[in-house]
């Protein structure tokens, strides 16, 4: 539900101009979905969701041809469904989290609000996105431009060197309980299922 709600902004208010720019809808929406989860369930839950997204991204990176791991795709002469994989979602949201981590949430949120105000009700291309972020967030700061690695995130395959894997300890109790059950150290009824949710 959170994902589809977030499409009110990224997908409806500002939408991708072509299927090559699909990540602009899904990467932003996945990022917003995580922010909604953080607001409702707290930081630890949001990071747990980020870890699951990151792990899925790692799996996808291993299975796709390198060109299909770029955010901005080249689907010329191809079925647009060829670009419908988790790269747009998970790499796109990881890219936005990287920008947030580098510039800080307050500054990033101010840029996000402005981005949607400036571009409301118009189709967006990746080039237009990059122009906007350079004009309204980077603002000519060469050191920040280098640190963000915008072009590497968008146009290069795989992940740039500034990608940071999220880390969560929240999975340990679940893994410990599952392992204890597996090795026969307790009945399934002893596992605290009531505290878990999906």
Segments (PLM) and residue ranges:
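Hydrophobic alpha-helical and helix-loop surface patches within well-folded domains
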Residues: 1-178
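Non-catalytic terminal regions of proteins
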Residues: 176-198
């Amino acid at each position: 539900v959170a994902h589809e709600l977030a499409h009110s902004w990224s997908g409806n208010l500002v939408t991708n101009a072509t299927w090559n720019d699909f990540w602009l809808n899904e990467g932003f929406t996945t990022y917003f979905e995580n922010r909604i989860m953080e607001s409702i369930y707290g930081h630890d839950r949001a990071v747990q969701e980020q870890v699951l997204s990151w792990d899925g991204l790692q799996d996808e990176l291993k299975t796709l041809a390198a060109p299909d791991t770029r955010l901005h795709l080249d689907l010329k002469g191809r079925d647009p469904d060829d670009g419908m994989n988790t790269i747009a979602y998970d790499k796109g949201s990881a890219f936005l989290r990287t920008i947030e981590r580098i510039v800080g949430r307050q500054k990033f949120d101010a840029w996000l609000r402005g981005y949607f105000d400036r571009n409301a009700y118009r189709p967006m291309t990746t080039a237009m996105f990059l122009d906007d972020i350079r004009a309204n967030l980077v603002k000519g700061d060469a050191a920040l431009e280098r640190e963000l690695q915008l072009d590497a995130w968008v146009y290069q395959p795989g992940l740039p060197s500034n990608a940071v894997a999220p880390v969560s300890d929240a999975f340990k109790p679940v893994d410990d309980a599952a392992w204890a059950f597996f090795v026969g150290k307790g009945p399934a009824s002893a596992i605290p299922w009531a505290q878990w949710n999906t």
